[in-house]
C-alpha cells in the first residue's frame, strides 16, 4: 500500500520525482523538519535524482521552507521549482536561490 504523505502530493516517482504541497495556501503551517524528513524518505525510497516542486497556486513560501528547498541538494538530488508565482520568482532571484534551484514553467 502506498504511504500517505502528510505534507506532499506525489505526482510522479522515480529518477524524476514531482511533488506539490498538500496545503499550498498554508505553507507557513508546515513543520519544516517533518517535511524535510518526509522528502528525504521519498528521495531514498524512489532512488530520486531530480526532485521537482510544483508551486502552481502557491502565493507565499516562508523563509524556512526556502532554506529547506535549498538544502536538499545535500541529499544528492537536483532540485527544480515548477511554476512559481512572480513574487516567489522575484524572491528566488533576490536571494540568489535561483542559482541552486532551477526554475521552470511547465504545463499542468
Would you name each region that the model predicts?
Residues 2-37:
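STAS-typified acidic loop motif
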Residues 100-108:
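Short acidic-hydrophobic, aromatic-tinged amphipathic segments that line or gate anion-handling sites
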Residues 15, 86, 108:
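Residues that form or immediately flank small-molecule/cofactor binding pockets and catalytic motifs
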Residues 25-101:
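Amphipathic alpha-helical interaction surfaces in cytosolic regulatory modules
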Amino acid at each position: 500500500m502506498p504511504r500517505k504523505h502528510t505534507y506532499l502530493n506525489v505526482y510522479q516517482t522515480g529518477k524524476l520525482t514531482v511533488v506539490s504541497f498538500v496545503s499550498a495556501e498554508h505553507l507557513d503551517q508546515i513543520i519544516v523538519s517533518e517535511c524535510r524528513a518526509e522528502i528525504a524518505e521519498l528521495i531514498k525510497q524512489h532512488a530520486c535524482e531530480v526532485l521537482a516542486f510544483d508551486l502552481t497556486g502557491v502565493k507565499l513560501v516562508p523563509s524556512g521552507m526556502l532554506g529547506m528547498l535549498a538544502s536538499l541538494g545535500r541529499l544528492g538530488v537536483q532540485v527544480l521549482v515548477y511554476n512559481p508565482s512572480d513574487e516567489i520568482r522575484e524572491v528566488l532571484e533576490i536571494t540568489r536561490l535561483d542559482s541552486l534551484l532551477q526554475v521552470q514553467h511547465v504545463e499542468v
